[in-house]
């Protein structure tokens, strides 16, 4: 059943356009989760490097009195990443995501837009903060997998997330594949959301100035 669902997921068309500057513009339509579904695009390296731009459409507010689930405000929306350990991404994957904070929560202040990480391991997901960002800015990102760690390099900062090598014991039956923009969490997009992504050659310089260990 999982194999059938994967084929359906990877063979339909996508809501994306490519422009002369090399950026692909992915659109998540209002009331949808996905920016589209995609032909299988294999990862042929241990890393991907890309540039990404979020604009004001990445800002949303589920904390109004009319929202029955204001906690959904802090769900991690997905931008880009890849599956891992030869498994479906719901079993094992790593992704860059984002959240908009419409009210203060922990270290996050109302009105802040943040990059966040999202990891699936053993079918369970977990995520956390990376860095505060600004709309309409270009960020260069590398996501790399090492034996026991995932590494996010965002401009001049490096962040480390644990990677459970024990997942190698799982049946490895498929290549790693790219994961594309998706809104949610539980909520669907409250309005049209556009995300610009440009694939780059994998960055092997590893020149980050700041390294932070996450989970």
Q: What residue ranges belong to the model's regions?
A:
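Sec-dependent signal peptide recognition
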Residues: 1-7
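Short tryptophan-centered beta-strand motifs in secreted/extracellular beta-sheet-rich domains
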Residues: 50, 137-145, 150-154
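Flexible glycan-contacting loops in extracellular carbohydrate-active proteins
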Residues: 164-199, 203
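Secretory/extracellular carbohydrate-interaction modules
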Residues: 21-114
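C-terminal motif of bacterial Sec signal peptides marking the signal peptidase cleavage site
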Residues: 12-14
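Surface-exposed coil/turn segments at beta-strand junctions on protein surfaces, enriched
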Residues: 43, 132-136, 145, 172, ...
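Activation corresponds to long, low-complexity, non-globular regions
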Residues: 17-28, 208-215
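Short, aromatic/His-centered strand-loop micro-motif at the edge of beta-sheets
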Residues: 114-140
């Amino acid at each position: 059943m999982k194999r059938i669902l994967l084929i359906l997921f990877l063979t339909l068309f996508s809501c994306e356009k490519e422009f002369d500057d090399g950026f692909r513009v992915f659109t998540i339509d209002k009331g949808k989760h996905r920016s589209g579904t995609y032909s299988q695009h294999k990862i042929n390296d241990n890393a991907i490097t890309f540039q990404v731009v979020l604009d004001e459409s990445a800002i949303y507010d589920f904390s109004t009195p009319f929202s029955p689930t204001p906690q959904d405000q802090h769900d991690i929306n997905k931008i880009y990443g890849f599956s891992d350990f030869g498994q479906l991404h719901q079993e094992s994957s790593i992704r860059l995501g984002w959240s908009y904070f419409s009210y203060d929560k922990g270290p996050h202040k109302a009105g802040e837009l943040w990059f966040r990480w999202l990891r699936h391991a053993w079918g369970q997901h977990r995520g956390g903060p990376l860095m505060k960002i600004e709309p309409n800015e270009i960020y260069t990102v590398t996501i790399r997998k090492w034996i026991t760690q995932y590494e996010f390099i965002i401009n001049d900062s490096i962040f480390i997330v644990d990677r459970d090598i024990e997942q190698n014991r799982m049946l490895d039956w498929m290549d790693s594949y790219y994961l594309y923009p998706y809104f949610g969490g539980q909520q669907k997009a409250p309005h049209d959301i556009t995300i610009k992504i440009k694939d780059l050659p994998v960055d092997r310089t590893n020149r980050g100035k700041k390294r932070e260990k996450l989970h």
